[in-house]
Amino acid sequence: MSFSGLKHSITQYLEEIPSQVQTRLYKSPATCLAIYRLLPTLAKFFIMTVIFNDKDISLRDLDRWVKSNGKLQFQEAIKSMKSLHLLIPTRVNGQLLINLNPTFRESFRNALTGGEVNNSFGIVVDEDRLDTVVNLAVLDEYAATKWETILHFMVGTPMAKMPSENVLNLLKHSKLMEEVPDSSEFMITNEGFQFLLQEVNSQIWSLLLQYLKLAESLHMDPVHVLNFIFMLGALETGKAYSTENLSETQLKMLLDMRDYGLVFQKTSNPNIFYPTRLAQMLTSDTKSMRTASGAMESVLNKPDDAAKSTDDKYDSLEGKAEDIQDGALIIETNFKLYSYCNSPLQIAILSLFVHLKSRFANMVAGQITRESIRRALINGITADQVIAYLESHAHPQMRRLAEEKLQKKLELDPNCKDPLQVLPPTVVDQIKLWQLELDRVLTYEGSLYIDFDTAQDFNMLCKYAQDIGALLWKDDRKRKLFVSREGNAQVLEYAKRKIKKKEE
């Protein structure tokens, strides 16, 4: 899920809550600031234009500010603001006038001007009142450990420490993981693998959206839940904040947010918490690396004043070796794969659908095989997801060669409609064929009966198995039959009775 798609999901959730709840939300300046950041660019422009104007404005006047080729964006901006009840429409003498929601306007003004914010941005604790100051390095290590513990668990990496019970329940509730029948173990689902392909900010919000839905079933106040989430995104990393103004619901949330690595608390002083860099990503447009571990490293090791987009780095095909993204891989037409990574998490993700053979200091080598793809398919990963993962992590050199090849085709035939093929077509086609092969074949657990003395014995047992609904397959010529696991005991008992009767 791209961050634009994620914004749509968050906005959609906010649109679906009752207007009375929305009005309560808008009493928090921090929440208003976060919602403003989620709006389309044109909607932000309109809000900043009218925020200090208490008079009603004609919708036609706003329309005049937009060029003819931007009418679609204009409609989307107005629609998004109306659905969130940020605009209050009125009709005067047949003319449609609009103005900002008064509650939102007052809170957003206070957020911009530093007015009365009612501690919605947290209560900072002076360092003089702290026994020890927690530095950024500790917070970064804590956040990385907590978050990657969740990701490692999802890909099945053997770990000394499991995620908390709350995290496991959320993974199960969000259908990212499912329990293996007759076992206490969990396995990743189709949605879970797609989750691993997302950027870290998208991953965090995907979990928190499920947390919001789970909170509803637990009768937690949605206003307190949302206010706390948006507040975390507005806090300053490295500062200590007091729990003094938090509600009972938010204090409970604080314990859950610790499990996700969004906040840090010292056991010796539970009245103080520290937001981590992961919490900053809740209201940030900054895009992270495509890989899970690479994203963590990028966000946690990035200086506060670093504003360079990582997309610029990835879009540049010419670069130094150290500029190549962690996990960039090369695939040959013989299905051999080379991935430039040394992250245990990245290697664990690859092992879900690649047979890894060798590991070096900064690279792993393996091969995509029928068995490795079948294992991934059985675990709920689709062929399209595997292909999408390989394409998104393709080495820049592979992308450049693919673009050069497509450019030559366009020079010969300007009407060429061929897509950009980053991966070898043989690899893509074969992965899809392996999925079709698995879709055609159904597997059943049961027992095979062979070596019948006579055709009469075979037909008799075959008829009995068919009558009780246990017969799955038979071969009259070779005198073989296959019965289900559930019906095998009955068929076996029947066969023993007939053999005993025959011997008598």
UniProtKB/Swiss-Prot annotation:
<dbReference type="GO" id="GO:0001671">
    <property type="term" value="F:ATPase activator activity"/>
</dbReference>
<keyword id="KW-0805">Transcription regulation</keyword>
<comment type="function">
    <text>Component of the general transcription and DNA repair factor IIH (TFIIH) core complex, which is involved in general and transcription-coupled nucleotide excision repair (NER) of damaged DNA and, when complexed to TFIIK, in RNA transcription by RNA polymerase II. In NER, TFIIH acts by opening DNA around the lesion to allow the excision of the damaged oligonucleotide and its replacement by a new DNA fragment. In transcription, TFIIH has an essential role in transcription initiation.</text>
</comment>
<comment type="similarity">
    <text>Belongs to the TFB2 family.</text>
</comment>
<dbReference type="InterPro" id="IPR040662">
    <property type="entry name" value="Tfb2_C"/>
</dbReference>
<comment type="subunit">
    <text>Component of the 7-subunit TFIIH core complex composed of XPB/SSL2, XPD/RAD3, SSL1, TFB1, TFB2, TFB4 and TFB5, which is active in NER. The core complex associates with the 3-subunit CTD-kinase module TFIIK composed of CCL1, KIN28 and TFB3 to form the 10-subunit holoenzyme (holo-TFIIH) active in transcription.</text>
</comment>
<keyword id="KW-0539">Nucleus</keyword>
<keyword id="KW-0234">DNA repair</keyword>
<dbReference type="GO" id="GO:0003690">
    <property type="term" value="F:double-stranded DNA binding"/>
</dbReference>
<dbReference type="GO" id="GO:0016251">
    <property type="term" value="F:RNA polymerase II general transcription initiation factor activity"/>
</dbReference>
<keyword id="KW-0227">DNA damage</keyword>
<dbReference type="InterPro" id="IPR004598">
    <property type="entry name" value="TFIIH_p52/Tfb2"/>
</dbReference>
<protein>
    <recommendedName>
        <fullName>General transcription and DNA repair factor IIH subunit TFB2</fullName>
    </recommendedName>
</protein>
<dbReference type="GO" id="GO:0006367">
    <property type="term" value="P:transcription initiation at RNA polymerase II promoter"/>
</dbReference>
<dbReference type="GO" id="GO:0005675">
    <property type="term" value="C:transcription factor TFIIH holo complex"/>
</dbReference>
<dbReference type="GO" id="GO:0006289">
    <property type="term" value="P:nucleotide-excision repair"/>
</dbReference>
<dbReference type="Pfam" id="PF18307">
    <property type="entry name" value="Tfb2_C"/>
</dbReference>
<dbReference type="Pfam" id="PF03849">
    <property type="entry name" value="Tfb2"/>
</dbReference>
<dbReference type="GO" id="GO:0000439">
    <property type="term" value="C:transcription factor TFIIH core complex"/>
</dbReference>
<dbReference type="GO" id="GO:0000112">
    <property type="term" value="C:nucleotide-excision repair factor 3 complex"/>
</dbReference>
<keyword id="KW-0804">Transcription</keyword>
